[in-house]
Amino acid sequence: MGLLEEYKNAHIIEKIISNIYLFNRFNSVYLFGSLLLNDRLKISDVDILLVYDLFSNDILDSEKLIRSKLNCLTGYEIDLIILSSSELEELHFLDKLYSKYLKIK
């Protein structure tokens, strides 16, 4: 398991990572929220931040596919936040997570 052994929900994280192809359209992908808590019972959903450089309509298609596929794989609601690289910086989104995120791409 390696880097993921610190997470009690590593089996869910591994399912997401094993389907990394779903995120090909995005430059960066981060997991955050209750999935990363070390409590298997408190997962409310799977929070994923997707970062892109240039917007195009295929982002919307990718969003639907990611949500559907990962919901089936994990059994949890998939909450996606999609930001451009510039929005990510302007909003300081990662700073607001206080390093409680896992970059998977």
Residue ranges and their predicted role:
Residues M1-Y30, L36-I43, Y52-K105:
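Catalytic core of pol beta-like nucleotidyltransferases
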Residues V46-I48:
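Amphipathic, hydrophobic secondary-structure cores in small proteins
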